[in-house]
Amino acid sequence: MKQLLDFLPLIIFFAVYKFFDIYIASGALIAATALQLVVTYALYKKLEKMHLITFAMVTVFGTLTLVFHDDAFIKWKVTIIYALFALALGVSQLLNKSILKSMLGKEMKVADKIWAHVTWYWVSFFAICGLVNIYVAFKLPLETWVNFKVFGLTALTLINTVITVFYLYKHLPEDQRKELK
């Protein structure tokens, strides 16, 4: 259920874009992201920082897109969110307070060096995706960007999540690996 809630705004954005245009889709994205927060809080009685940051960014850049009738704002949102994720992960790692370790370290007991590798891998991933988004958003047709945002970035994120899980699994202590089998 939680994963469906995470993808709900993206699905709504894509569907509305296909039937209408980028401006109505941007408004729908704002509404869907707000709905996501309300439903998430109603079900789980808490909100993750990532959801709040995403909602703030969607609201600001979606509103700017609507007010100025310029799709450049909603296109920049993706790059800025990825840049913020990369920055947060990178700074946390430099301060020896890995966000990823704090999120997953209770379930996966691996060496700090491995958490550092995973963190820098995701910093690189988010930075590259942000840069590729700039190219696709401003050099290719709008429909290509929407498809890239919805399908390309989602698929890349899922693939990188699987790679990360396999990498972490490979470095788990033997007793913990047996528990997962």
Swiss-Prot record:
Q: Where are the transmembrane segments?
A: 10-30, 50-70, 72-92, 118-138, 148-168
Q: How does it sit in the membrane?
A: Multi-pass membrane protein
Please report any disulfide bonds recorded for this protein chain, giving both cysteine positions.
none
Subcellular localization: Cell inner membrane
GO CC, sorted alphabetically, is: plasma membrane
Briefly, what is this protein's role?
Plays a role in cell envelope biogenesis, maintenance of cell envelope integrity and membrane homeostasis.
What's the protein called, per UniProt?
Inner membrane-spanning protein YciB
